[in-house]
Amino acid sequence: MSVVMLVFRVLLLIALVGNSAIGLSLMPFIAPPDPDWTPDDYYYSYEQSSPDKDASVTQTSPENPDWYYEDDDPCQSNPCEHGGDCIIRGNTFSCSCPAPFSGSRCQTVQNKCKDNPCVQGDCLITQTPPYYRCACKYPYTGPDCSKVLPVCRPNPCQNGGVCSRHRRRSRFSCACPDQYKGRFCEIGPDDCYVGDGYSYRGKVSRTVNQNPCLYWNSHLLLQENYNMFMEDAETHGIADHNFCRNPDGDHKPWCFVKVNSEKVKWEYCNVEVCPESDAANPVGSLQEPVMELPGFDSCGKTEMTEHAVKRIYGGFKSTAGKHPWQVSLQTSLPLTTSMPQGHFCGGSLIHPCWVLTAAHCTDMSTKHLKVVLGDQDLKKTESHEQTFRVEKILKYSQYNERDEIPHNDIALLKLKPVGGHCALESKYVKTVCLPSDPFPSGTECHISGWGVTETGEGSRQLLDAKVKLIANALCNSRQLYDHTIDDSMICAGNLQKPGSDTCQGDSGGPLTCEKDGTYYVYGIVSWGQECGKKPGVYTQVTKFLNWIKTTMHKEAGL
């Protein structure tokens, strides 16, 4: 099957009706492509229900399938950054920002170092009063780095190093014991990096040109993309220090250095690659084996507040970090004349090295596939994204299509480690749990995706909505799918508000259901009919639990 024909058949549309979502399979033909299409050429069309009607939630029943409700609140996604409080003001909002942040969304860090209060040191921005501190150059000390300590008293050399004074009172040197180095003998023999150094957490703070690194919260870095106040800084090992790091996936650790009083540049660091014998457990790196990583500490947990998690977004831009297990499958192949290469299917991260998706999304070579984790905006490369190649595709052996309907539509993607690791857990990248028991009909669940359609139209922003599970007996009724739903499938959606709609969601993406604050991937977006009128059809994950676990263990050699 050609790639173009494949894409015609794999992309599932989940209809947003009012603020609800149901599924649609592709027609056997495609509309003439728009040569001027860009990812921004889309719109949301939805009907608003009356406030009185939306204020109540009716009980579910086959006669009254009201499986969806909404809650419009400008603060529901907490648009305020850096811990700001969102305050509703009519139909809009304002942000109450904690110091030292300001701006309409608390996005700006106030520079408390403009008057250069540090005489012999670097002025650093902090989040506690007076919202700055001075990092003094040795042997200077004091709140403004103006006082000089007696050199070598006390001994600044670490790990048994011996301090020697020079003629100039501020000059000294450390004689380091064997295998230790650095200005203060602070760098040990195992301080090295593996791979590209993304996981490096050592203490080297000098560049290959022997320039000292700036602190990541230096006031000089406030306009840089990488600093202590960036999204997910801790995940990248960035904090109140000046140690070398590699947050952007360059080929080795680096840092910023000072050029003059106002200008900075970056340089690679003077840190060594670990010898092969030490590469498995470098002291300065996250210790994760390549072949099989242990799972994250927990699954199915977001770092959103409970209040925010339970709100409905229904077709609006999803909050970053609300679906941290959402995966974007992307290809280097052109999909259609109107759909450029890039995102074409969704998936769910169920283990640091494993992605769960639909089998019909995997009819191409691994060399043309990549997996992007933590993605929110398809047109931007965001700092918290993690990208991996696919090492292996494993489809369920009994996957097949009959009358253009996929059966047993499930596959696993084994990720190829980068720098000795697969996915690293962060606010934006987490695993979702596998369910152990079925969820009852009427359970409210979540769908998410970028809404890619067969003509290439879709949202650049991740969208989400809530739907409710529908009993297979009802979904198999003559008015719906007329006995085409088998026990490996589950339906979810809304039949209450047919009409003007925009479709969202991606084949292979997750249908997640929550229990006791934990999210489980209960379904995989598979197929559907009549966008906006019939429920979406999902692969029921509980039917394949044994295959999923057995496959992962077999590939790990367990």
UniProtKB/Swiss-Prot annotation:
Intracellular or extracellular location(s): Secreted
Record PTM text: Proteolytic cleavage at Gly-23 or Met-27 can give rise to the 50 kDa heavy chain (HC) and cleavage at Arg-311 or Lys-317 can give rise to the 27 kDa light chain (LC). The HC can undergo further proteolytic cleavage giving rise to a 26 kDa fragment. The LC can undergo further proteolytic cleavage at Arg-311 leading to a 17-kDa fragment and at Arg-478 leading to a 8-kDa fragment.
Domain EGF-like: 71-107, 109-146, 148-186
S-S pairs: 75-86, 80-95, 97-106, 113-123, 118-134, 136-145, 152-163, 157-174, 176-185, 192-274, 213-255, 244-269, 299-433, 345-361, 353-422, 445-513, 475-491, 503-531
Site, as annotated: Cleavage: 478-479
Annotated EC: 3.4.21.-
Residues at the active site: 360 (charge relay system), 409 (charge relay system), 507 (charge relay system)
UniProt keywords, alphabetically: Cleavage on pair of basic residues, Disulfide bond, EGF-like domain, Hydrolase, Kringle, Protease, Repeat, Secreted, Serine protease, Signal
Keyword Cytoplasm: no
Quaternary organization: Heterodimer; disulfide-linked. Heterodimer of a 50 kDa heavy and a 27 kDa light chain linked by a disulfide bond.
Name of protein: Factor VII-activating protease
Biological classification of the source: Eukaryota, Metazoa, Chordata, Craniata, Vertebrata
